[in-house]
Amino acid sequence: MLWPALRSVLFQLDPERVHHLAHWALHRVPLAVARARRPASIPALAVRCMGLDFDGPVGLAAGFDKGDVALPGLFGLGFSHVEIGTITPRPQPGNDRPRLFRLPEHRALLNRMGFNNEGMEACARRLAALPPAARLGPVGINVGKNKVTPNEDAAADYLACIERLHPYADYLVVNISSPNTPGLRQLQERDALDRLLRACVRHLAERAPGKPLLVKLAPDLSPEALDEAVDVAIAAGAAGIVATNTTLSRAGVERHPRAAEAGGLSGAPLERLATDVVRRCYARAAGRVPIVGVGGVMDAEGAYAKIRAGATLVQAYTGLIYGGPAFVGRVNAGLARLLERDGFSTLSDAVGADHRQGGGKAAG
């Protein structure tokens, strides 16, 4: 196993520098190599969701590719879909460095990146230049508002991103749950969320009828606020719920020297909380829209827990950082074994299984 040795070397370097090195390498993977190296798909894991076909449930969460568009390299790792972003209308540098920290004892990351990206125009140019063959699966684009945009004007930022980027996206995600943009999470409140999502859904429907628009929620909402957000999102026409973003909680890492740093926590400490949020969202949605489970997907067991809790798809980022290039292949192989163990013919049969077997009581 070469990855543990390489990881120990890379973890001696600044986390953001390693991120850029990884992106540089992935950007240079030829399409032919990506196709050849991509793990073989497993028929039982195929998913059809929101009118799109996924050759497996495991996608790359937003935050890794912020518009550099290293799609062949990322798909070559085995991801069934890649979510680019978060992208804002105008370029912005994000928060001051250092802003990304590893907590290796806990298999976690803590970040306060702040939507650093080169803006929607740069992202659109790169996606437009990409050959169609480079899309080895669905591509999502996660959009947000610029830091300097007040919340009362936030809708204009989201609409601008949808307008510019929708031709290149198989689906779009409205990100209102990052803890690293001041005031952003206030957009999850009932009236603000309703106004924003209705405007976004209408705008996209006028330009690309049938193209899915999802909303990404925080794991730190109260049970009542989460139920309300799911209801509002569905009533506004959202095609799905992405649950969840990073957490402000430090449960499980309280004694770590980095615990006092500002930012959102991801990785293994988030796994149970995020799965509980998936479970509650699934119960509240009652089959009306799919749930995409994100947060603490570090292995097949974690992915399977979210699927049984109600996630049709799952996404990972921190799991890739700790698991290395073979991460997705291991998760998919493990999922296939777990499905067989529990008597499921397909992954879709396992979605929400805990609810049907009496284990789906909503958290809270």
Curated annotation (Swiss-Prot):
The active site is at S178. The keyword Membrane applies. Binds 1 FMN per subunit. Pathway: Pyrimidine metabolism; UMP biosynthesis via de novo pathway; orotate from (S)-dihydroorotate (quinone route): step 1/1. GO terms for biological process: 'de novo' pyrimidine nucleobase biosynthetic process; 'de novo' UMP biosynthetic process. Belongs to the dihydroorotate dehydrogenase family. Type 2 subfamily. This is Dihydroorotate dehydrogenase (quinone). The lineage of its organism: Bacteria, Pseudomonadati, Myxococcota, Myxococcia, Myxococcales. The gene is pyrD.
